Amino acid sequence: MESLSELQNPLLPRSPTHLHRPYPYPEAPPGWSCQEQLYSFLLGGAGPARAHQLLDPGSLQLAVEAWYRPSCLLGRDKVKEPKAGSCETSFTEAREPLAGPAEEGSEPGQAAEDVTIHTVSYGVQEELQGQEDSQEEESDGTSSESECEDAFLTLPPRDHLGLTLFSMLCCFWPLGIAAFYFSQGTSKAISKGDFRLASTTSRRALFLATLSIAVGAGLYVAVVVALAAYMSQNGHG
């Protein structure tokens, strides 16, 4: 150790010109005898070089340089670090933007598809419900009509015997006699089981009896008016 700086920093390299070299290991000066001693020590030589070997930072650097090139040793780490950093940044940058647009692009499509599915299913349900309701209404209408027809057919037609007798005796008797005839025909058709003929004769008997009553009532009114007019004329005379 020759100066105070070397005593304070014994492990620093001697030459400060290593900053502008391709690698930070300084070369030993040409007049330095430690290189020859290091080679003899590494090659297994004996003698004073091996016995009086001193600890020097330059010797450690030369020992590494003797077997490996410094650029290979340091270049590997220097190449790894930026590559690792670039891989991490490129991986994260490539992953995040790809995930974002994919999600943004897929979400509207999925929402629109869901809305379309719900709308179609809702329309189909409405159509099915409308068809079911219309079928139920039609079935109810047909069932009610059939029930009415069945009830009408099961009920035997009436002969209107009392009405025909009243029209024959108390009203216009020719129409009353015809109504009584159809009333008897209705009773015979019912006894035979011919409900179609019975309903026809029953309607005719009802019509003739009603007409006979109307005509008879008109005749009675006309007779009363004529009698009143005749009596009024006789009273004045």
Swiss-Prot record:
Extracellular side of membrane: 1-161, 226-237
Protein name in UniProt: Synapse differentiation-inducing gene protein 1-like
Domain of life where this protein originates: Eukaryota
Predominant location: membrane
Residue spans crossing the bilayer: 162-182, 205-225
Database matches in Pfam families: CD225
Tissue: Expression is restricted to the caudate-putamen. Down-regulated in R6/2 transgenic mice, a model for Huntington disease.
UniProt xrefs under InterPro entries: CD225/Dispanin_fam
Cytoplasmic side: 183-204
Signal peptide, first to last residue: none
